[in-house]
A protein has these predicted regions:
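Mid-domain alpha/beta scaffold segments of enzyme catalytic cores
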Residues: 1-293
Length: 293
């Protein structure tokens, strides 16, 4: 099967939404977790992505991620050229670096120093994913809260965005955000998959809201209701790949190209045209991450 073919969950070829030439952005991916990051970037170019933001963990790949990006992009360029797609651009790739809340107990002074060091790389546009995760509770809540506050403060100091991972902990996360303060550059409520009531206080704080595969799930009516309430200038799209592929690809390994399906559903939920949704979310992402500075 050609790398330019997109398949649904039944392994049938599926067409991507038509954004009429507009570009889209995957604001939260884990490229290093994919079998072939270069291939994924080539496919994302075919799916009209102009920007992919990948996450680097201080406990895994923070030292190497920035050095890997150009090699992946060059290989993606070669794949596209070899397949005859010489006019398709490989998306820009930027990085978010931090310590996941599930790993908060692993954080050391050396880890904190490494985050600070890597965050000064020009490709790094945010701190994260940071926050609270009470679903697995692999780290004590108090330790998670302390790390969350530290990373919010670091994002503010460096004037870059904080990417928030919050699971089963929204009330406590609000408490930390209010006590520590929002970073000057803003914060992203990543992979939002709850209803309007949970979202409201985060909107009041000024958070951007990023939607991923769960927005497309058939029974996720509350998530789509929440999306409809987000001011257009706060909307973002993402995959969180390789996890939670959107419909019609649910059950497969997720990849940045599948942002197109989430963007298509976001357009429907918000009443925007496909082109309008692409233009709004892409512009929001580039502005938030300072891609044009």
């Amino acid at each position: 099967m050609s790398f330019s073919t997109f398949l649904n969950a039944k392994k049938k070829e599926v067409e991507l939404p038509d954004f009429e030439g507009a570009l889209i952005a995957d604001t939260h991916a884990h490229l290093d977790m994919l079998e072939d990051p270069a291939r994924a970037l080539a496919r994302s170019g075919l799916a009209h992505l102009g920007l992919v933001v990948t996450v680097a963990s201080v406990h895994e790949n923070a030292r190497t991620i920035c050095d890997s990006l150009e090699g992946w992009r060059q290989s993606a360029r070669a794949m596209l050229d070899a397949a005859g797609f010489v006019d398709i651009e490989v998306p820009e790739v930027r990085v978010i670096v931090g310590g996941h809340p599930q790993d908060a107990s692993k954080m050391t002074d050396e880890g904190r120093a490494l985050i600070r060091e890597v965050a000064r790389n020009k490709r790094v546009v945010g701190i994260g994913e940071t926050g609270l995760d009470y679903f697995y509770e692999t780290s004590p809540r108090a330790v998670q809260k302390a790390q969350f506050a530290e990373e919010l403060a670091l994002a503010d100091e460096l004037d870059i965005v904080a990417c928030l991972h919050i699971r089963d902990a929204h009330d406590d996360a609000l408490e930390v955000l209010r006590s520590t303060g929002m970073p000057r550059a803003g914060a992203i409520l990543h992979c939002y998959n709850m209803g309007p009531e949970t979202l409201a206080p985060f909107l009041e704080l000024g958070c951007m809201v990023s939607f991923a595969g769960p927005l497309t799930f058939r029974k996720a009516h509350d998530v789509r209701e929440a999306a409809a309430l987000v001011p257009h200038e706060r909307l973002l799209t993402e995959t969180d790949c390789p996890f939670m592929a959107p419909e019609p690809c649910r059950g497969q390994t997720n990849e940045p190209a599948y942002t197109a399906f989430t963007a298509g559903m976001l357009a429907e939920a918000t009443g925007l045209s496909l082109r309008e949704c692409a233009e709004v979310t892409y512009s929001n992402a580039r502005k938030l991450f300072g891609c044009d500075k």
